[in-house]
């Protein structure tokens, strides 16, 4: 993991086409702006983890329903 220090208004580049700029800082949070191509998905980690967990649950429920349908024949 790379750890970098940045001040308000400063940026970092990821590859050639993603730029992250520090917009504001306060005691408990950092506000960033992300400039990236539309095809790049950007999610907060907690949202990504929630979606991932919901997808796992959906697969389990779908397989349970499929088993029930198969057994009813």
From Swiss-Prot:
It is found in: Cytoplasm. Keywords: Bacterial flagellum biogenesis, Cytoplasm, Repressor, RNA-binding, Translation regulation. GO terms for biological process: bacterial-type flagellum organization; mRNA catabolic process; negative regulation of translational initiation; regulation of bacterial-type flagellum assembly; regulation of carbohydrate metabolic process. This is Translational regulator CsrA. A translational regulator that binds mRNA to regulate translation initiation and/or mRNA stability. Usually binds in the 5'-UTR at or near the Shine-Dalgarno sequence preventing ribosome-binding, thus repressing translation. Its main target seems to be the major flagellin gene, while its function is anatagonized by FliW. It holds the Pfam family CsrA. Disulfide bonds: none annotated. NCBIfam families: csrA (TIGR00202), PRK01712.1 (NF002469). Homodimer; the beta-strands of each monomer intercalate to form a hydrophobic core, while the alpha-helices form wings that extend away from the core. It comes from the Bacteria. GO terms for molecular function: mRNA 5'-UTR binding. Its main location: cytoplasm. GO terms for cellular component: cytosol. Belongs to the CsrA/RsmA family. Signal peptide: none annotated. Gene3D superfamilies: Translational regulator CsrA.
